[in-house]
């Protein structure tokens, strides 16, 4: 029975690949799962969604101008007895009234149009925020991968240097080397430990940044983050076209569409302001019950239906309407300038991300060759030292160069992935459209196109061969 239950559980897990793996007591997210979690929990996105809901309420309010309104009102008062009068002391009335707008000078139509435009604008702003959060999550995720890889590199480097120190101490005891070699090994190890501590601190900060994007609370005194991530820092070549990116950004970026809606809103607001200078006509009907104070006119209690038309027209309002229209025209001109500024800003974002991507490509090409050169230099230094033609200082310096070049290559891969994330956000495009391999796949993938950065950043097993 237990084996059957285990088999069923494995089938369910295989049928749900989108669910995060559980490492220990915390979930382990891939980068796509991290983006999905942020889309669901990020505070900025939640606030933007509430604003969208609020605009729907504004639309319902504006639409009410097309519908009849039903109101009831009543009055009761009792006056002090007056001398030389036969009027009744009590006065009361109650009415149930139905009102319907017949003509508002375009006010109701404009209010409904503005409400619809506000809904569209809020949705575009939500899309912009969601895109920005996606970019931030991708950057934070890659930063965490980078810092985790740096920790591994520094740990391996400390381990190798520690073994070298022990080796030199043993050789000193055997009388093979002098004390200077031991001191150099001690200095090299002492210099490397702060780099490890710094990498560990940066890794903790990366977890905090990603937790903030997730909207997760980190408990005071917690030694570990409430989640874990899976994958390795990888480089995937991508060569998008700048002109295509600029065209896509100008046509699809939500912030540009939101600024366009601002202009349309001000156009409708101008019609709404102008409606105050036109007549407004309302029809009404209802049923009324009221008292007659004068006994000579009729009985005290009266009731009956009422129907009529009410029209108002502000002939002169002290130029209030003119002032509102002037202010609306100024806001529209400002909205046009804001749209132009948004287009320039988006184009600048695209170009900046594109240039960063090109720079990262060049740095990666250079550092890949540099890593190979540093590896060869280390092997030569080790060979010379073993043959008695070199010094231990040459080996330590070569090992330091290898660690530094491989760490630099890790940083270049991170900058490449960051530039791709920024470019995807700037173009309002998905990762697939930009050929951005955002999914951190297995190292031994079928086509072998993804290069595992940690493999080329791993320090040598040993420094000395003697």
Model-flagged regions — what are they?
Residues 7-18:
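Bacterial N-terminal signal peptides
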Residues 22-23, 80, 408-466:
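Acidic, low-complexity, intrinsically disordered peripheral segments
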Residues 71-75, 97-99, 282-286, 312:
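Transmembrane beta-strands of outer-membrane beta-barrel proteins
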Residues 172-176, 385-389, 426, 430:
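A short glycine-centered flexible hinge/capping loop motif at secondary-structure junctions
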């Amino acid at each position: 029975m237990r084996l059957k239950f285990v088999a069923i559980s494995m089938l369910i897990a295989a049928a749900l690949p989108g669910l995060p793996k559980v490492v220990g007591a915390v979930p382990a997210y891939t980068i796509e799962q991290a983006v999905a979690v942020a889309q669901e929990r990020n505070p900025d996105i939640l606030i933007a969604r509430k604003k969208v809901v609020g605009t729907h309420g504004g639309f319902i309010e504006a639409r009410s101008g097309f519908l009849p309104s039903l109101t009831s009102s009543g009055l009761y008062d009792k006056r002090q007895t007056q001398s030389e009068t036969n009027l009744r002391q009590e006065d009361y009335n109650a009415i149930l009234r139905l009102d319907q707008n017949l003509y508002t000078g375009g006010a109701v139509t404009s209010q409904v149009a503005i409400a619809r435009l506000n809904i569209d604008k809020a949705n575009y702003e939500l899309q912009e925020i969601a895109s920005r959060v996606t970019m931030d999550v991708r950057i934070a995720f890659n930063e965490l991968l980078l810092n985790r890889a740096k920790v591994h590199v520094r740990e391996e480097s400390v381990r190798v240097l520690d073994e070298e120190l022990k080796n030199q101490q043993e050789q000193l005891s055997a009388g093979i080397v002098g004390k200077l070699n031991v001191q150099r090994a001690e200095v090299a190890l002492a210099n490397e430990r702060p780099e490890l501590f710094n990498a560990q601190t940066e890794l903790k900060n990366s977890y905090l940044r990603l937790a903030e994007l997730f909207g997760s609370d980190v408990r005071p005194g917690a030694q570990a983050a409430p989640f874990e991530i899976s994958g390795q820092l990888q480089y995937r070549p991508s060569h998008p076209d700048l002109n295509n990116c600029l065209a896509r950004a100008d046509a699809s970026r939500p912030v540009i569409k939101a600024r366009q809606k601002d202009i349309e809103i001000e156009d409708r607001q101008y019609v709404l302001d102008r409606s105050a200078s036109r007549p407004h006509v309302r029809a009404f009907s209802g049923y009324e019950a009221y008292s007659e104070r004068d006994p000579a006119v009729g009985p005290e209690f009266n009731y009956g239906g009422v129907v009529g038309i009410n029209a108002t027209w502000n002939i002169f309002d002290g130029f209030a309407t003119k002032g509102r229209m002037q202010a609306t025209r100024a806001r529209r001109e400002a909205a046009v300038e804001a749209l132009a500024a948004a287009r320039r800003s988006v184009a600048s974002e695209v170009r900046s991300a594109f240039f960063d991507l090109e720079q990262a490509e060049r740095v990666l090409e250079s550092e890949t060759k540099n890593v190979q050169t540093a590896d060869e230099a280390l092997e030569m230094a080790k060979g010379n030292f073993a043959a008695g033609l070199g010094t231990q200082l040459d080996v330590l310096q070569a090992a330091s160069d290898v660690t530094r070049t491989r760490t630099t290559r890790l940083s270049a891969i991170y900058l490449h992935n960051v530039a791709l994330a920024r470019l995807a956000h700037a173009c309002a495009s998905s990762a697939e459209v930009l050929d951005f391999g955002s999914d951190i796949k297995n190292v031994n993938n079928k086509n072998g196109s993804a290069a595992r950065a940690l493999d080329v950043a791993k320090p040598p097993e040993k420094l000395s061969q003697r």
